[in-house]
C-alpha cells in the first residue's frame, strides 16, 4: 500500500510513487539533471511519510544500490575503477543536496567507454573457434563474484559468458528436438496422419546455429545500449536514491510517467497497433479491432515501419534502428491529429498510410470473466482483475469497480453458484476503487484507515447498501498481489 508518502489520497499502488518535475524549455540535459536531484531531495525530505536522515550512512547505502543497478553482473567495471568510485561512497548525500553530477558522470562515462571495448572483445571472441572441451567456471551470482582485476580477466569473463550462452542455446535446440520426437512418437502410436517433420542437427551443426544466435543476441544487446540516452541512466541513478530511502518510492522520468499512466488508465491515443523491434527493424505487431490501423485496411502484422510523420507539414522521421519506446512516441499524439506511416510490406512494396489518431482501449488492463463448468454440473464465475485501474482525468472513463460490477451482473444472470476473483499479479491501484468494489460484495461499513505523515487518520467507508453478490466467493492471490489486492482480500 501507499504507506510512505503524505501525498497519496488518489493512488494506492505499492511499488510506485511518482516524482515528476517540469522543466523550462531552454534547459539542457545537465541542468535538468541538477534540478531533478534537488527536487528529489526536497520531495524525500519534506513530503515523505517517514523521512530518514540524508547523511553519510544513507550515502553509503545509495552507493551500494547504484553499483548493483549499473553493473549487476560485475562484467563491466574493473576493481581499480570501483576503488576510484568508492572514494565517493559517503559523498552522495552532499551531491544530492546541491545537485552535483560528479559521481553520476564519472560512472556513466566509464560505462560507455567500457561497453565499446567489450563490444570489440565480443566480436573477437565470436570470430574464432571456441573450445568447449576445456573446463571453465563461470560465477553467475553477483554476491559471490569479484570485479575483474585487469583487462585480461575482464576479457576472459566475457569469453566464459559467451560460451555459457552458446551452451544454453544448444540445450534449447536439444529440448526442441526432444519435443518434436515425443510428438512424432505420439502421432505414430495413435496411428494419426504424420505431418511432423523432424529437424535433426548434428552436434557440430547445433554449435554453429547456437553461435550465430548468440552473435545476433550480442549485436542486439550492444545496439540497444548505444541507443540508450544518458538521461536513461540518470533515472537509474535517481532510483538508487529513492529506493534506498524507501523501496516503494520511485523516480519516474516524463516518459516513464506517460507509460505508467497509459497502463494504469488503460487507454492511449494512437493507431491501435503493438510495435515491435526485430534485428533493428521496427515492425507492426497485433492490431486492435476497430482502431485506426485496423480500419485503414492497409496495415498488416509484420509490416516494417520505415518513417513516421508525426505532425502534418513536418518532415517524416526515419525510425529504422530506433528503440521501440522512442518510435512509439512519434506514433502517439493528440486525439484527432494525423499521423502518416511509411511501411515496407512483406512483398517489398513501399506504402504510405494516413490515419487519424483515436483513443484506443488497452483491454488487458480491464476486468474480464468466463464461466467455469464444474465436474458437479454447477457453473462458477471466474473474474480476472489485472489492476485497480481508474481514470482520474475523465469522470466518464473506465474504472475497476464499474467493470467488476458489470461482470458480476453478467455472471449472476447466468445463474453461477459462486464467484472466483483472481487478483494474482495485481499490484494494486486506486484506493477509491477497492472501497467501491468492496461495496459490490458487502453492506456499508469501514474498509480501510489511512494515516498521513502528521498522524491524522481517515476512515474510508463503503457506502453501498445493495451488494451485487452475496453468495460464495473465493479470492485468489500470490506473492505479487499487493496493496489494494490485500485490502480487498482482507
Q: Model regions: which residues?
A:
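Extended, small/polar residue-biased N-terminal targeting/export presequences
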Residues: 54-60, 67-142, 222-277, 338-340, ...
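Acidic/histidine-rich, surface-exposed loop or edge segments in extracytoplasmic proteins
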Residues: 37-49, 67, 87-91, 216-220, ...
Amino acid at each position: 500500500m501507499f504507506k510512505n508518502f503524505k501525498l497519496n489520497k488518489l493512488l494506492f499502488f505499492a511499488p510506485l510513487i511518482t516524482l515528476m518535475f517540469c522543466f523550462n524549455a531552454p534547459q539542457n540535459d545537465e541542468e535538468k539533471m541538477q534540478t531533478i536531484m534537488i527536487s528529489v531531495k526536497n520531495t524525500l525530505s519534506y513530503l515523505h511519510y517517514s523521512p530518514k536522515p540524508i547523511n553519510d550512512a544513507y550515502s553509503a547505502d545509495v552507493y551500494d544500490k547504484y553499483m548493483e543497478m549499473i553493473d549487476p553482473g560485475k562484467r563491466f567495471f574493473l576493481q581499480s575503477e570501483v576503488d576510484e568510485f568508492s572514494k565517493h561512497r559517503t559523498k552522495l548525500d552532499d551531491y544530492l543536496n546541491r545537485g552535483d553530477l560528479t559521481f553520476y558522470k564519472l560512472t556513466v562515462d566509464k560505462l560507455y567507454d567500457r561497453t565499446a571495448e567489450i563490444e570489440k572483445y565480443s566480436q573477437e571472441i565470436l570470430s574464432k573457434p571456441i573450445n568447449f572441451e576445456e573446463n571453465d567456471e563461470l560465477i553467475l551470482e553477483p554476491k559471490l563474484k569479484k570485479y575483474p582485476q585487469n583487462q585480461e580477466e575482464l576479457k576472459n569473463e566475457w569469453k566464459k559468458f559467451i560460451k555459457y550462452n552458446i551452451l544454453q542455446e544448444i540445450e534449447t535446440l536439444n529440448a526442441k528436438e526432444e519435443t518434436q520426437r515425443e510428438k512424432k512418437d505420439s502421432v505414430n502410436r495413435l496411428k494419426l496422419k504424420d505431418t511432423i517433420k523432424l529437424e535433426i542437427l548434428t552436434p557440430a551443426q547445433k554449435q554453429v546455429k547456437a553461435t550465430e544466435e548468440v552473435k545476433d543476441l550480442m549485436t542486439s544487446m550492444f545496439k540497444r545500449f548505444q541507443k540508450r540516452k544518458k538521461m536513461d541512466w540518470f533515472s537509474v541513478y535517481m532510483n538508487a536514491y529513492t529506493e534506498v530511502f524507501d523501496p516503494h518510492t520511485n523516480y519516474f522520468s516524463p516518459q516513464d510517467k506517460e507509460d505508467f499512466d497509459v497502463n494504469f488508465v488503460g487507454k492511449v491515443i494512437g493507431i491501435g497497433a503493438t510495435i515491435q523491434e526485430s534485428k533493428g527493424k521496427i515492425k507492426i505487431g497485433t492490431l486492435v479491432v476497430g482502431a485506426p490501423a485496423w480500419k485503414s485496411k492497409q496495415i498488416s502484422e509484420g509490416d516494417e515501419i520505415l518513417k513516421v510523420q508525426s505532425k502534418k507539414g513536418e518532415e517524416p522521421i526515419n525510425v529504422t534502428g530506433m528503440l521501440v519506446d522512442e518510435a512509439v512516441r512519434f506514433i502517439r499524439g493528440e486525439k484527432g491529429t494525423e499521423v502518416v506511416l511509411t511501411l515496407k510490406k512483406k512483398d517489398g512494396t513501399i506504402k504510405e498510410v494516413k490515419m487519424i489518431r483515436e483513443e484506443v482501449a488497452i483491454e488487458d488492463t480491464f476486468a474480464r470473466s468466463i464461466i467455469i463448468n464444474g465436474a458437479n454440473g454447477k457453473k462458477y464465475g471466474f473474474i480476472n482483475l489485472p489492476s485497480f485501474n481508474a481514470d482520474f482525468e475523465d469522470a466518464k472513463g473506465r474504472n475497476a469497480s464499474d467493470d467488476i460490477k458489470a461482470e458480476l451482473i453478467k455472471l449472476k444472470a447466468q445463474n453461477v453458484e459462486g464467484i472466483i476473483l483472481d487478483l494474482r499479479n495485481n499490484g494494486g491501484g486506486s484506493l477509491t476503487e477497492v472501497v467501491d468494489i468492496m461495496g459490490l460484495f458487502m453492506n456499508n461499513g469501514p474498509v480501510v484507515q489511512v494515516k498521513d505523515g502528521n498522524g491524522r487518520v481517515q476512515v474510508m467507508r463503503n457506502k453501498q447498501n445493495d451488494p451485487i453478490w452475496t453468495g460464495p466467493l473465493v479470492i485468489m492471490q500470490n506473492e505479487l498481489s499487493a496493496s489494494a489486492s490485500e485490502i480487498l482480500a482482507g
